[in-house]
Amino acid sequence: SDLLHWHANAAEWSYVIAGHCRITVIDPEGRSEVKDFGPGDVWYFPRGHGHSIQGLGNEECHFVLVFDSGYFSEFATFSMTDWLAQTPKEVLAKQFNLPVETFNNFPKKEVYIAQGPVPEALPTDPPPASENPPPLTHRFRLGAKVPEVVPGGTFNVVTQKDFPISATMSGAILKLKPLAIREMHWHPNADEWQYYIKGRARMTVFGSKGRKITREFGPGDVGYVPMGYG
């Protein structure tokens, strides 16, 4: 499990490639949402929303994390375990109205990822008044959306129109057939960040005044195109 934490200077967008996980997210109003995610699912956590990620089953869970700021830093990521480790036991006892000795075996430093038991399945019909969900869900099932089929492949996009909570990020899954080309284009209102999952591709970026750069990409590579560049 990736234990409860939040990011002070960036929102988080993710696409699940393989495996399954359970997300718990708490917004600043104290409303919480618990959802299971699988391949093709997308999550979005606005800046400051606390969240944890727990693996499900016996398989690994692989997902791509993207942050909406190039200034994202672990120094602006705040962990609940780190905070508790830095807080005197006497203060914790008053905070949670528990005996001081309750905290004797708490970690003495941040726990980034912890191994734990596989959680039970979520109830299909939660007990009445047991949930306090936020008005907008943090999950979008992009893999279940019917893609646009074109002669050179398929294209599936999720924007804020589809996923209202995702105010600062849009995402797309582009699958190109062998030797197919994504036609010349540009985005006037956003930068483009790319992650290559399978296959190989070549991209040329045009920056005006005769400037261009061409690079080849393969699995695990990242591409970036500034706003307005062709």
Regions found by a protein language model. Give the residues of each.
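Short acidic-glycine-tyrosine-enriched beta hairpin
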Residues: 13, 27-48, 176, 193, ...
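Ligand-binding loop in jelly-roll beta-barrel domains
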Residues: 11, 38-39, 47-74, 218, ...
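A contiguous, mid-protein "functional segment" used to position or interact
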Residues: 62-106
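Histidine-centered metal-chelating micro-motifs
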Residues: 2-3, 22, 41-43, 47-52, ...
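A short, N-terminal "cap"/entry segment at the start of jelly-roll beta-barrel domains
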Residues: 1-4, 91-177, 183
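Fe(II)/2-oxoglutarate oxygenase catalytic core
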Residues: 60-62, 168, 190
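Glycine- and acidic-residue-biased ligand/ion/polar-headgroup-sensing regions
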Residues: 7-29, 178-181, 186-209, 219
